[in-house]
């Protein structure tokens, strides 16, 4: 059977459910697919289908994530849901599932819980730009004043983590009662069941409140170099995948990282042995560089639009350290530890200068399984920017994953 072609007729958005364990994230994911299936815009997925999330690897870390897709009238969504709390932490730090927005699920019966706060904090740190709240289990709260108090508490919590708590849409409802209604009658239309209507209302809010993101092709050009070849009579070719932006033959780019930044002109572009006029984000290309010798270029450098990225050696980061069971270290480590930091296409040795916990208290050591903030100094400058992901490796195996919070130097 021929594979279906992916038709791009609507804007595409990546979204996910976040929140405390047992507050109803997976049930809500099922309810959304079922409610939208009833409107003819998606395929229904049962709770069991979503909950048995397959394992996937991102930056050497195994994560369980369920991916579902659905459509509203205006948009196509790819939705991620993780079964376990550790999976969320790993997912968000590794950027395995980049989110343009998130639906924060909070049980109206419990209000914000420790993991609710941890997920909001993580969303802020790793750059999830927008959150919409689903106040689940509304049917378990008889008192409307109590419901208002929980909503206020959620808004306050979001504001504490620098999200616009006063403006964020908060939609009460019951994922379970929606799923039950849709299981009995999969063809329910708007106006026939109040619980299903609340799910449709949630998706209307997601449609309007979460903006369509700037796509990678519209950003400043950047390509991490994976390999360098010398072609007799033509010059030096750098190969790699265009991470963002677009590039045309004749444009000027900078070579950034590991050595002094140099400027060069692109004299040719090739993909699958054919020459191109222009390369776009996602393309694997060979780039012919004018006036550059093979030994001027090495794996780990980047080609970028001039003055859009700089080489740095010191940064602050949020990291997750793998447990022994996940293939990580068996013992704690201390300040001064010198692992390799794998950034884009290369390993660079770095020294961990200091650790702090979420509330910025100093920490003495880091145990396998910890999530911690750390300041790092690399022995060589490389192209780094806020929000960039990296892996921490030791002797070729991954022992942690991180995201850059800020550049120090």
Swiss-Prot record:
- Per the UniProt entry, what is one GO biological process? mitochondrial translational elongation
- For the tr-type G domain, which residue ranges apply? 10-214
Q: Which GO terms describe its molecular function?
A: GTP binding; GTPase activity; translation elongation factor activity
Any idea of its EC number? Answer: 3.6.5.3
The annotated region (G3) lies at 81-84
Q: What is its main location?
A: plastid
Region G4: start-end pairs: 136-139
UniProt-listed PROSITE patterns: G_TR_1 (PS00301), G_TR_2 (PS51722)
Q: Which residues form a coiled coil?
A: none
| Segments of this protein annotated with the region G5 | 174-176
**By its UniProt entry, which CDD domains does this protein fall under?**
EF_Tu, EFTU_II, EFTU_III
Judged by the first EC level, this protein's enzyme class is: hydrolase
Alphabetically ordered keywords of this record: Chloroplast, Elongation factor, GTP-binding, Hydrolase, Magnesium, Metal-binding, Methylation, Nucleotide-binding, Plastid, Protein biosynthesis
Which annotated residues bind GTP? Answer: 19-26, 81-85, 136-139
Q: Where is this region: G1?
A: 19-26
Please tell me where Mg(2+) binds in this chain: 26
**Residue span of region G2:** 60-64
The record's subcellular locations are: Plastid, Chloroplast
Q: Where are the transmembrane segments?
A: none
One Gene Ontology CC term in the entry: chloroplast
> Where in the sequence is N6-methyllysine found?
57
Q: Catalysed reaction per UniProt?
A: GTP + H2O = GDP + phosphate + H(+)
Q: Family assignment?
A: Belongs to the TRAFAC class translation factor GTPase superfamily. Classic translation factor GTPase family. EF-Tu/EF-1A subfamily.
Function recorded in the entry: GTP hydrolase that promotes the GTP-dependent binding of aminoacyl-tRNA to the A-site of ribosomes during protein biosynthesis.
Name recorded for this polypeptide: Elongation factor Tu, chloroplastic
Primary gene name: tufA
